[in-house]
Amino acid sequence: MNERFFLLPKEKQQAILNAGYRVFSRNSYKKSPMSEIADAAGISKSLLFHYFYNKKEFYLFLWEKCAQITIETLKESGCYEQEDLFETMYRGLRAKVRIMKQYPDISAFVVKAFYEKDPAVCGEIQKSCERYLTFKRNAKLLRLDPEQFVPGLDLQMMYQDMYWAAEGYLWEKSQHGELNVEEMEQDFVQMIEFWKKIYLRREG
């Protein structure tokens, strides 16, 4: 890509990113026209291709930028410093809300990109997220204390159940247009409280 993109004002960079996230989250990779992205960003198609040489490069840049934004925001929120699973979830939720207020279509883009089948990009997307997904699906990497949970609970199964419930929620909502941030936050708080009631060990 052309490094001059990073010399643009932050507001213009964000407008281009948001235009890409919006168009790609609503269409397949193949059916997402760069002209529509340029229009949404308020720039010409030729200028968009000045910064990104082709659609594939722009698509993969959006994917990597999403990972960068997410990791930085999670670090700022202290998610990697917590050992309490549900406190980590609450902090992660607040981080997700912060991100979505800046980039409204970013979560829908991630879901769409993960399931994208176009051979032009799917191999690189899957390779990129393999390590990330291995961590997210593996409760053993989170240093969970069995004493905090109901006796005999399979922590790996519990964590996978919560992971797939969250992913399924995002997939379902993304199929019906733009995700509502406030609604998503309320729904996830309810899910976390439900999980706490059924999985945490009760005193006495």
What residue spans do the PLM features occupy?
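Hydrophobic/aromatic-rich alpha-helical bundle segments in the mid-to-C-terminal region
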Residues: 111, 122, 144-193, 202-204
